[in-house]
Amino acid sequence: MKVIAFARNDLGTGASRRQRIAGLTPGIVYGGTAAPVNISLDHNALYHALKKEAFHSSILDLEVDGKVEQVLLRDFQVHAYKQLVLHADFQRVDAKQKIHVKVPLHFINAEISPAVKLQAGIISHVATELDITCLPGNLPEFVEVDLATLEVGHSIHLADIKLPKGVVAVIHGGEDNPTIATAAVPAGKVEEAAAAPAAAAAPAAPADKK
């Protein structure tokens, strides 16, 4: 995925405001052995790119004044109530050095799982992204979580996920095998199921004598 940008020398709040009025978004490229470079990007192109999931978790080819570098989107700021991207940060990557990044989780086969198909359960996504490390060439756009065998009362944990080659999950909070998804029957359905046998066992009301 390619991103076009231009180096900028006018810095400060006033300069950034003028950039936005002109339809540009200020940004910065940093990392590696080169010095940080302040850049400008076309606002509309950046705004629409940010809507794409892959833009947030892929190696990008950033062209600045004709020179192309491989980067990751590391941060961006948007206006509180306007459809306006205020700033974007990109980090250079080295093909030989591992990167640390979050990638989205894609949940598949929920509709054929026993929890949904046979037990009228609801699957809850405890996590929606995964912290990983890998070489840039091994970076996946997303990681799949297969729910095909999930049953009510059970969970999918990190150890159940097949990670792509060269990808290692980063675990936080001291939990060795965090929960990724769970399956349960909604409270209302549990009450209905419990009430049904009781209703069946209740004696019929005597008929009125005429």
From Swiss-Prot:
Record Pfam families: Ribosomal_L25p, Ribosomal_TL5_C
Gene Ontology terms for molecular function: 5S rRNA binding; structural constituent of ribosome
Gene Ontology biological process terms in this record: translation
GO CC annotations on file: cytosolic large ribosomal subunit
Gene3D superfamilies (UniProt xref): Ribosomal protein L25, beta domain, Ribosomal Protein L25, Chain P
Matches recorded under SUPFAM superfamilies: Ribosomal protein L25-like
Signal peptide per UniProt: none
Keyword Transmembrane tagged: no
Keyword terms, alphabetized: Ribonucleoprotein, Ribosomal protein, RNA-binding, rRNA-binding
Subunit annotation: Part of the 50S ribosomal subunit; part of the 5S rRNA/L5/L18/L25 subcomplex. Contacts the 5S rRNA. Binds to the 5S rRNA independently of L5 and L18.
PANTHER family: RIBOSOMAL PROTEIN L25/GLN-TRNA SYNTHETASE, ANTI-CODON-BINDING DOMAIN-CONTAINING PROTEIN (PTHR33284), RIBOSOMAL PROTEIN L25_GLN-TRNA SYNTHETASE, ANTI-CODON-BINDING DOMAIN-CONTAINING PROTEIN (PTHR33284:SF1)
UniProt function note: This is one of the proteins that binds to the 5S RNA in the ribosome where it forms part of the central protuberance.
Family statement drawn from the similarity comment of this UniProt entry: Belongs to the bacterial ribosomal protein bL25 family. CTC subfamily.
Protein name (Swiss-Prot/TrEMBL): Large ribosomal subunit protein bL25
Organism: Herminiimonas arsenicoxydans
Lineage: Bacteria, Pseudomonadati, Pseudomonadota, Betaproteobacteria, Burkholderiales
